[in-house]
Amino acid sequence: MNKTAIALLALLASSASLAATPWQKITQPVPGSAQSIGSFSNGCIVGADTLPIQSEHYQVMRTDQRRYFGHPDLVMFIQRLSSQVSNLGMGTVLIGDMGMPAGGRFNGGHASHQTGLDVDIFLQLPKTRWTSAQLLRPQALDLVSRDGKHVVSTLWKPEIFSLIKLAAQDKDVTRIFVNPAIKQQLCLDAGTDRDWLRKVRPWFQHRAHMHVRLRCPADSLECEDQPLPPPGDGCGAELQSWFEPPKPGTTKPEKKTPPPLPPSCQALLDEHVI
């Protein structure tokens, strides 16, 4: 499937339910031992943790949206990464969307983030902590040129390279999605230490943030992991294909309805949503 078709499918998936979804009616985590259920784009979570809003190492954006819930492994990853960043004097980590209290489908903006194992992190590290007003209405820093072929040199900082590398080297991380131009710059800057680049995957948009995805926890038996990324650093022909013009004759895919929920997620909805 060509890149344009994939982009359209992703857009349709993320906007298939712009009306409020039943998952938004669940305002607190579902009690129980932490269990990520289903796939990243069709699942839910029992026993989610709440990311502490107050931290000296990170700040949480758009708290009014209440998307700061996730599997305990995700909360620990955020705390671990932000502590590393702080200890290196790199700045404050800005945390975007995680998931809703019980996971599940958003009403727009995300096709994934459903099992409590995804988090968006801004690709900027302010030295001065943001105000409450800035956090509620954050201003993203677009690192990619208008033509989409490279990063803006005046905005690309060594600290951003280090932030992505630190995240990719974490034992629980399986994928990090960034814009192809950002992946390209990482390839240029990486030097001989390149194993971590395998986890960094080019994807549409993602011009101002990285989308970090964790592996399924070992005790979440109903969690569906993705296959591992292809071997290698991903800096060759695969990456360059993202910069090629779309092939002629590309057609818009038909709008698809969301797939059925995993049975455990449907049972959760039936029990907790009136």
Curated annotation (Swiss-Prot):
Complex formation: Dimer.
GO biological process, one term: proteolysis
Top-level class of the enzyme under EC nomenclature: hydrolase
Record field: transmembrane: none
Residues annotated for Zn(2+) 1 binding in this entry: 110, 113, 120, 211
Keyword vocabulary terms for this entry: Disulfide bond, Hydrolase, Metal-binding, Metalloprotease, Periplasm, Protease, Signal, Zinc
Start and end residues of each stretch annotated as Disordered: 227-274
EC assignment: 3.4.24.-
Location of this chain's protein in the cell: Periplasm
Disulfide bonds: 44-265, 187-235, 216-223
Residue positions binding Zn(2+) 2: 147, 150
Protein name according to UniProt: Penicillin-insensitive murein endopeptidase
InterPro entries from the UniProt entry: Hedgehog_sig/DD-Pept_Zn-bd_sf (IPR009045), Peptidase_M74 (IPR005073)
GO CC term (a single one): outer membrane-bounded periplasmic space
Signal peptide range in chain numbering: 1-19
Manner of cofactor binding, per the entry note: Binds 2 Zn(2+) ions per subunit. Zn(2+) ion 1 is bound in the active site. Zn(2+) ion 2 is bound at the dimer interface by residues from both subunits.
NCBIfam families to which the protein is assigned, alphabetical: PRK09429.1
